[in-house]
Structure formats: structure tokens, C-alpha cells
From Swiss-Prot:
This is Phosphopantetheine adenylyltransferase. ATP binds at T10, F11, H18, G89, L90, R91, E99, N124, S125, F126, I127, S128, S129, T130. Its main location: cytoplasm. It comes from Alteromonas mediterranea (strain DSM 17117 / CIP 110805 / LMG 28347 / Deep ecotype). Its EC number is 2.7.7.3.
Length: 162
């Protein structure tokens, strides 16, 4: 069975937690689309194009993973991509309530779309893009939290030694 799954997010930047979920999803589904939301209201550190390129490099060894940017409603984009599975990561119980509401809204907007929740590996359970950026901003080491490509991009963008 050919199942197209969509893993959406802002990924500003992609972390080891995201990369772990992408790799595991690529083993569960025949095709995984990493859908990077434009979302200018979040004021991202990296442009959409930069995030797409970073994630393409991080996932280069996963042949069934495609990386694309998108704008608009996720439910509509999933329909355009013929995706029937929406992958979401749950780091803690605190994530569940919001994700539950989001899953119900997406199902209402696109009845063919089923949400599948994956939990991160224990060593990644506390990592978030926001925390990685904060550590990098204060010259902390981020190598344990993100791919070397991302670490270098953070150094280049923030102009500091991490």
C-alpha cells in the first residue's frame, strides 16, 4: 500500500527531534513529505528557502522523503499532495491538548486526513527549535541538538561562535 504522509512544521531550525521523527516516519510510510510552513507571523530566523535547503541536506540519505514549502491551510495542502496521514510529534502531555484540537480541525477540513502522533526518542524529548536558537544566541554549544548543517547556519546567521 502506497501511503503518503505529511510532516508539517515551521522547522526554524530543524532539530535532532524533528530529524528523528522524519527518519522513523520514513520507515512507517512509503512517502513522507516534510511540509515547511511559511508562517511569517512567527518571524522566523531563517527564510522558507533556507529552511527547505537545510532540511533537504539533513534528510539527504532518506530516499522516500520530499521537502517542500507551503502557504495556506495545511488540510488543503495535504489534499493537493494526496497525503492521507498527518504526522505530529508529541514531546510531552502538554502538547497533547493543542494537537488533539488541531487533529480534529484538520479532519473536519479534510475528512481523508488522519493524524498519527509520534513521540521523540528520550534524548530528544526536551529539544525545541526555540530552545536551540536561544542556546545559539547566547553562544552555547548546540551540536547535541541539531545537525552540523544547522549548527553552521546558526553560527552564520547569528554571527557568533557556538
Amino acid at each position: 500500500m502506497h501511503t503518503r504522509a505529511l510532516y508539517p512544521g515551521t522547522f526554524d531550525p530543524i532539530t535532532n527531534g524533528h530529524a528523528d521523527l522524519i527518519e522513523r516516519a520514513s520507515q512507517l510510510f512509503s512517502h513522507v513529505i516534510v511540509a515547511i510552513a511559511s508562517n511569517p507571523s512567527k518571524k522566523p530566523l531563517f527564510t522558507l528557502e533556507e529552511r527547505v535547503e537545510m532540511i533537504k541536506k539533513v534528510t539527504a540519505d532518506l530516499p522516500n522523503v520530499e521537502v517542500v514549502g507551503f502557504t495556506g491551510l495545511l488540510a488543503d495542502f495535504a489534499d493537493e499532495q494526496n497525503a492521507t496521514i498527518l504526522i505530529r510529534g508529541l514531546r510531552a502531555v502538554s502538547d497533547f491538548e493543542y494537537e488533539f484540537q488541531l487533529a480534529n480541525m484538520n479532519r473536519r477540513l479534510n475528512p481523508k486526513l488522519e493524524s498519527v502522533f509520534l513521540t521523540p526518542a528520550e534524548e530528544n524529548s526536551f529539544i525545541s527549535s526555540t530552545l536551540v536558537k536561544e542556546v545559539a544566541l547566547h553562544r552555547g554549544a548546540v551540536s547535541g541538538f541539531c545537525h552540523p548543517v544547522v549548527e553552521q547556519a546558526l553560527r552564520d546567521r547569528l554571527g557568533k561562535k557556538n
